[in-house]
Amino acid sequence: NAIGYFHQRIFQYIAGCKVPENGNDGGWDIIYTNKNGIKLPDETVIHKIYVEMKNKHNTMNSAATGKTMIKMQNQLINDDDCACFLVEVIAQKSQNINWGVTVDKKKISHKLIRRVSIDKFYSLITGDDYAFYKICNMLPKIIKEIIDNQEKQIIPNDTVIKELKEMTRNLKINIEDLAIQTAIFMLGFGNYKGFEKNLG
């Protein structure tokens, strides 16, 4: 959760991004505005993106998925110069695609409702294909603090640190903290821009 919170809050320091307080501005996690226009992959140009952010691609059940889709459809009805993104920190792959879901047994989608991996979102809002990779390279100190604090706490059924340490045994890096950081990146971001050439 700390890493997810970090990923959401850091956007307040990126030009054009607003991170509303909980429940404000329609409950969106991030609102990105660019008066010069934002070009989507299909060449559509809009000026605002409303973002629902999820830490991992498989964290929404069908009810939450349907609710999110309806929220996005309602936003498009109220603002025809926007797009709505489901941004996933750990997506199945690097992507910026139309998001289609089944609601009430009907498959629905809209070209302005998109499922986007975080690397593609950073690229879109910064103009730098490697922006997410660069930010992640600044994270070692934060990750070390999280790991140090995690090991001091007793949390039932939490096997993430144990699994990461097991992954590091397969890496040929002697420094455990660096190996854990690399394992985290491999686990979640192996096919994102910048990571694929450095971790593959």
Would you name each region that the model predicts?
Residues 17, 82-84, 136:
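Generic recognition of cysteine residues
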Residues 119-200:
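Non-catalytic C-terminal interaction segments of nucleic acid-processing enzymes
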Residues 26, 45-46, 79-81:
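Short, well-ordered loop/turn elements at secondary-structure boundaries
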